[in-house]
Amino acid sequence: MSTEKDYVVADIGLADFGRKEITIAETEMPGLMSCRTEFGQTKPLKGARITGSLHMTIQTAVLIETLVALGAEVRWASCNIFSTQDHAAAAIAASGVPVFAIKGESLEDYWVYTDKIFQWADGGLSNMILDDGGDATMYILLGARAEAGEDVLSHPHSEEEEILFAQIKKRLAASPGWFTKQRDAIKGVTEETTTGVNRLYQLSQKGLLPFPAINVNDSVTKSKFDNKYGCKESLVDGIRRGTDVMMAGKVAVVCGYGDVGKGSAASLSGAGARVKVTEADPICALQAAMDGYEVVLLEDVVSSADIFITTTGNKDVIRIDHMRAMKDMAIVGNIGHFDNEIEVAALRNLKWTNVKPQVDLIEFPKGNRIILLSEGRLLNLGNATGHPSFVMSASFTNQTLAQIELFTKPDQYSNQVYILPKHLDEKVARLHLDKLGVKLTELSEEQAAYIGVSPKGPFKSDHYRY
């Protein structure tokens, strides 16, 4: 492990390898490269000190260097203990950007690194957060509440909360009042994923959101592309790299049929699996049925299916009783943000055999075994390298524009959760059309007037569902 200077990465010697892959990724990320061209001279993020908590991948490296090109100072950590690509982290560290991320880091290190991305060398404070899952935001808000006298650190509900609370207490002791100062310095947060967005909306509804937030996840060019088309390619990639199991002919169960579930079902179906879906929402259940999938109860298929994938963003979706009833060598994995969709903690007292990194064989007393991928964390990033660069370009262009919005227009945003305006959503899409050879039909003035839009867009109302 290298700890020289202001970074922690697995091996700084991997920087050249990482740089070569970053160069390839840049050619597949036209949105971010266009942002550099458009904003590189004016540097709208000059003065921004961005704390970033998002998977430290090659694609994220292109995002980080775009933010820097637009004038920002950046400190970065991964939002998942298994998702870092060590050569990407090394390349970013070698470029001079402080990054704290190692694939397979411990939970203790994860929260230490989350603290480090707020600790600037000159003792200053972050003024922006770029988050994925909400952990960086939660770290600051929980600490500030503790400083205000609230009893928020006494009753951890999981091992991870116990570790998180210990790290907060350590910072409270080392820097009294720091959390409150850091909270008050934040101009805004941009949130990448469904789970983190849900956290922000809950805070907003309770009146506990102390700064503006932009919900990047619900930009159409994020949720309908990253969540769907990204998962469509990366889920099967992760299962294959982890298990080398042939999916054609297998029965696969996808728990949840939101955007991630839709992409996951398509991924498995495209690999030849016979896909069944479980769903609590009647609208999503009807969509699944009309897309040709059998919608079932997990309990009815748990003993016969071969592959189980959770996509819900909820907790305890696959429980210990389900896994106990599975056939021998069933594959169990998750592509939702957190690891609590699968009741992994209840498996800890069983026999675990590590097959290779992020692949474990777990044996039940009756002799049946399951293959657990990435310990129930994001398997597409733990067992593979995540979504392809092109689709991540759309997501990260949204992030870049959202950071510019909140940093440069503080008077236009109050302490609520916002979505990027439609014209910016359409802009993100436009930036990715040339790469695919797409030619847009242009409306005449008469046609545009007939449907009540501008010939240049936006073309849909805010409530339109794509």
Curated annotation (Swiss-Prot):
EC number(s) from the headed UniProt entry: 3.13.2.1
Cofactor dependency: NAD(+)
GO molecular function, one term: adenosylhomocysteinase activity
Enzyme class: hydrolase
Known pathway: Amino-acid biosynthesis; L-homocysteine biosynthesis; L-homocysteine from S-adenosyl-L-homocysteine: step 1/1
GO cellular component, one term: cytosol
Catalytic activity, reaction form: S-adenosyl-L-homocysteine + H2O = L-homocysteine + adenosine
UniProt function note: May play a key role in the regulation of the intracellular concentration of adenosylhomocysteine.
Entry protein name: Adenosylhomocysteinase
Native source species: Rhizobium johnstonii (strain DSM 114642 / LMG 32736 / 3841)
